[in-house]
Amino acid sequence: RYVFDKDIRKQNLLDSDFHNKQLDKPIEIIVTIDIINVADSDCQKLRAQLKGALLSEHNKVYIKFFAEYNKTEMLALPILSWGGDINHLQEMKQRGYLYEIDYIFNVIYIDSYVNLYSLFKKNVSQLVKNEKDEDKGILTKIQNTVDDLNDHIASLSGIKEFENKLTPEYQKFRDEGISVSIKSEIAVKGLYSNIIPYIKQDNDDNLYPTAGEGRKKLLTYSIYDILSDENAEKKINLFLIEEPENHLHKSMQIALSQILFTDTKYTYLFVTTHSPFVLYEMDNVNLVRIYSDRKINGISAFYKVPENYEKARKMLNRCLSEAIFANKVLLVEGPSEYMLFSKVLAIVHQFYEADGIYILPVDGIGFQMYISILDKLEIFNVIKTDNDLRAVKGKGTYSVLGFSRCNKYIGKELLPTEQIQENSISAKRALYNANIKNLDKIRSEHSVFLSKVDLENDLDEVMHDRLLTLLGETSPVDYLQDSKHYHMVELIEKLSDTDCRTIYNHYNFACLKEVAE
């Protein structure tokens, strides 16, 4: 906002604007803008305004904000410069508190608690324009009506009585042959001073006040949209939106997300949010994670939905948008793991979600997409994956898919990848036990936890007799793997607190301790 927003910049900078009040260190911000596309209208606007500061071969514009604290004046005055060569920038010309940049960029700052009525009244002259010929006649009628209204008000008995009382009181101080007259001055210039937006239901002539805060918020965005259109031809609109989720329920936040990230009007958009729902439709965005502790630097990562994930975009974004607000993320195979682990953590670590722990099922997406973003944002993540085998076509052998997956996640070939001859529970256990030393090393150094077999078989190893009792089935594994979702729900409803602690403390499910402790 200091770089682009004239309303903020004209306030200058105080000592509190300097990090930790280090007043001996000047503030310097450099914004780089790519203008390589000469056919783009926004690039053309910049090139036209920069003139001599930009040569034809320059493909980037550098905008520099510099402010040095003056201890005598007790403030810092901003200096803005720009150009196509970072080492030879020209200082911007200034007219009053406006810089050259203010004639190109139009900053639309939308506060999280913006007042609808104040916004409407402030901009009503821009929003409501009477430019048609027939409006002239209507305005004349309104003026005549206002004159009649003023005359009627002045003729009220209460007004006359007040005049009769006030005149002699005034004449006590100065008798100069005058009288006091009370007149109404309702004028056409205040034509819009009392108009208010109302919600009107289709097929219903009744008007409803826009009392709901969510409704007001949506009307506010609608007004800002109209105002931005007024400047779109002449200026580049920058939308700066603070916490748009306030007063909007989940479905409206998701609807707003679709508008913000798909409407070309919001090409240049900066959003601060605490809500994952606002990010559901994100694509081609730079995610910046701001920490609550005293870290100087935030963490950022560019995120684009890969082409092969476009069909699963909503699923990918939904889980990712929630994960990036967490401090720790446990990535699991699917809904069965999610349900079981949520149950266990809710018992052992009751407020795990409030403590920033999130369980993310990667079903249909895979681990890698999530891991890459979480790692870039420095969000601690734990992986729990199955010891899968896959038949090699025409060979009668099986590739060790689970081992290959682990090698991929840790970035080195620590586990053997030779094909094996058998696909069975015992073969998977034997493969695991033969490599347990390296698997434990991968656990401790990379937080990647491979199942001995899979969720159901590993759980059966932990509490076989207890599963027999709870499920009343001779083969708990087969039962849980048949109608997996339904039967897992049945199981977790029957698990006791003791059962949950048994699972939590067992080697097979050490991933839970890893993420919780």
Sequence positions of predicted segments:
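Switch/communication elements of ASCE P-loop NTPase nucleotide-binding domains
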Residues: 1-5, 192, 197-320, 338-339, ...
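Flexible phosphate/Mg2+-sensing switch loops adjacent to catalytic phosphate-binding sites
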Residues: 5-26, 295, 354-355
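Glycine-rich phosphate-binding loops of NTPases
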Residues: 10-22, 37-143, 403-437
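Conserved catalytic network of the ASCE P-loop NTPase/AAA+ motor domain
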Residues: 20-25, 54-58, 69-71, 99-103, ...
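Short glycine-/polar-rich loops that comprise or flank the Walker A/P-loop
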Residues: 25-29, 58-63, 103-107, 283-286, ...
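Hydrophobic positions in the central parallel beta-sheet of the AAA+
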Residues: 108, 239-241, 330
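Extended helical coiled-coil dimerization/tether regions that scaffold
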Residues: 125-237, 392-396
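Acidic, Mg2+-coordinating catalytic modules of nucleic-acid enzymes
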Residues: 319-329, 338-517
